[in-house]
Amino acid sequence: MLLAGASGSGKSTVLRALAGLLDEESGEGTGLPAPPTRPGETGLLLQNPAHALVAATIFRDVAFGPENAALGRAEIRQRVSQALAAARVGIDPSRAPLDASGGQQQRIALAGTLALDPDLLLLDEPTSMLDPATAQQVREAILEAAPGATLVIAEHHLEPWLPHVDRLVVLGPQARIIADGEPDSVLRAQQERLRAAGVLPAGPAAPPATRPGTGRQAAAVTASLHRVTVPSRGLTAPLDLELRTGRLTALTGPSGAGKTTVLRTLLGDADPTTGTAVRPEPARIAAVPQNPEHSFVAATVRAELTASPWAEDLPLAEQLLERAGLARLADAQPHRLSGGEQRRLAIAAALAQAPQLLVLDEPTVGLDAHRREAVRALLAEATARGTAVLVATHDPELIAAADDHLALPAPDPSGPPPPPRRRIPADALNPLTLCLLGILAAIGSFAVQTWQGGLLALLPTVLLAPFAVRTLRGGALRLVPILLSAAGLAWTTALLGDAPALSHEAWLVGLKEAARIIAFVAPGVLALGSVDATALGDALGQRLRLPARPVVAAVVALVRVGHLGRQWETITQTRIRRGLGSARSPRLLAGATLALLVDTLRGAEQQALAMDARGFAGADQRSWAEPSPLHRADLLGAGIGALLLVWPLLAQLLVG
């Protein structure tokens, strides 16, 4: 069944209701599937793939559903392998899924749903972030992978699915059904109504109009890349690109081809490894991220248009408010707008800066025909004002409307793999052994009674640190908070202790307290800093037999915490591009912190839903895709822990 409807009509809500993930507030459901008799009997793919990823590696992410179904390890591996192949993931399963591109993440999330082998498969725009060729492969894979399942697909682009579905249901406002039946019959009988509802385009996309003085030869070059490569970010082939005044350039290519890298290089967020990048000054560049909420900083829609100090033309801002169709929402809170309204607001706010260069990342993803047309109209407004526009997109209508088109080649599968994670001796130890090391060291630190004993007690930690640190920088970053805390404790002890303030005797007492706190915390921080969150969960669930659900929930949270830095970078860079301050501006940092908190809370809610969509809610008993073995090395680790326990006491005895 194909589920269609305008943006905000309730398609995602209907899918969640079918999956049993919503509580009824009013009315009653008839003909709904019975409650699942096993975890994963119903599989739901959410619209935002980043919220559907729950593990530290691609393998464990795809295995999450089969684990909830308590399958054996051999069957889990088989299902994961088949699902990865069916979804055309094509990247190393040991990689972190959040390091993948948006299109790759969408395929990973799809693989996680297919691995459930569900009887009812619910897909929310499963190919929205994919290039046409890959999207066709994924559609074929979905149909092949679920031959006996009931399939319900929510989609804005109907044409590719129509030959494969038996029923077309179209939703109007508030999820009310306005059409239901065999696809050809519905399209024939209600074509005009579907066009009016934004389900079908109003007509074929018009070719781009040639604007006076903006032909390719006449237009001046606004920004350019010459022989640019950034191999570390997927852009391996030398790239040449010219963006000209008043022209719209569409940037396309399969997932992982380097589209985001091209955008980041033009914006100055990534430096080319080879070649040169020429761009306007920062005040003349505007960008619209794929998630428009990352760019919002004001309390109202009207204030958002003039939030940037570079948006000085107030009449222009008012005009853009009208052109974007947001005048009636001028006093609304930006975060409360619909997805299409948020995208139009982000584009209008960017245009209010009167930029020479406008860069957009997938501005029409998840939008219906009317809202896609509204976005194209705003981009036409930008080029009419002489702005050079670059848009990374898979939208065929937007590509057809572009003046220029640059298609990046598919990444070379035979190219060099990403550098492997550096192995260290601590990797040979079970996570529980590393936890034991930290606990025993903390207990032993209470034996420190003098500054001499405290310094001597740190000797084993100093000698063992290289065996637990993957990089010098990473180890130093983990130790900085401890050292700052120790310095603060030494200062306050010397100032406020029993000895005369800041006297020689007081400083020695402060040194003792500082050494004790370092001995208490540092071994555990260094040991556990190398532990993979998923491996720790395996150990807690299998070795200590802790309840699986809280263990898994904690592991998912730890994985997300490890990627907060990426969210922080996106949020702060977006604000810096709008001229709202430098990376060290207190005002910018305060606003970015609040935005990160809001983004994290919303993401956590969506992730909980994604976990339940893969059987987590009903997983009273679950299995683990990988074992958590104990080896001989763990005996050595336990011995080191015993040394850390008794050494501070021995050190104290040695110094007398």
Question: What is the meaning of each model-derived region?
Answer:
Residues 419-453, 457-462, 566, 570-656:
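Transmembrane alpha-helix interface motif
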Residues 174-199, 397-400, 407-421:
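Conserved beta-strand-loop-alpha-helix hinge in the C-terminal portion
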Residues 75-92, 223, 314-329:
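Conserved ABC ATPase "signature" region
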Residues 121-125, 358-362:
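Catalytic Walker B motif of ABC-type/P-loop ATPase nucleotide-binding domains
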Residues 113-114, 145, 350-351:
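ABC ATPase C-loop
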Residues 110-111, 138, 347:
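Hydrophobic anchor residue at the start of the ABC signature
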Residues 96-100, 104, 333-337, 341:
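Conserved ABC ATPase signature
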